[in-house]
Amino acid sequence: MLFRSGEGDEEEALLARGANFQVPLYSCLAGFVEPGENLEQAVAREVFEEVGITVRDVTYVASQPWPFPNSLMLGFTARYGSGDLVLDEKEILDAKWCRRDELPMIPGSISIARKLIDLWMMRG
C-alpha cells in the first residue's frame, strides 16, 4: 500500500482497479518478484511499472498464503517518492489517491490487501 500527504497534510492511499477485475473493485498494487531482485526492489519496480510512481521507505507488514497460483502474498507499505500517475493500461484500468473518508469498493476481509487498507484506516 502506497501513501502520500494530501491536502492539509491528510494522508492519502493509492488504490487501483486491475484490468482483470470483473467488478469496480479497487485494491493495492501487486506483482511478482523477478530473479535477482530483493523484495524492496520488487515493490519499487512493480509500482513504477504499473503507475509510474517512485517509492521510498518500503516496509514489510505481513504475509498470506494464496492458492492461485500457489503463491505467498507479501504485504508492504511504502511512501510516495515522486512522479505523476501514468498507468500501464494492460494491467491497471484506473488508479487514484483516496482519503480515508472516500474509499471506493475494496477487497473483502480475507485478503492481505484489505488488511493493509484496514491498518491504514486505523492509523488515521
Annotate each language-model stretch with its function.
Residues 6-11, 19, 79-84, 100-102:
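Short loop segments at secondary-structure junctions
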Residues 22-26, 88-124:
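Nudix hydrolase/Nudix homology domain
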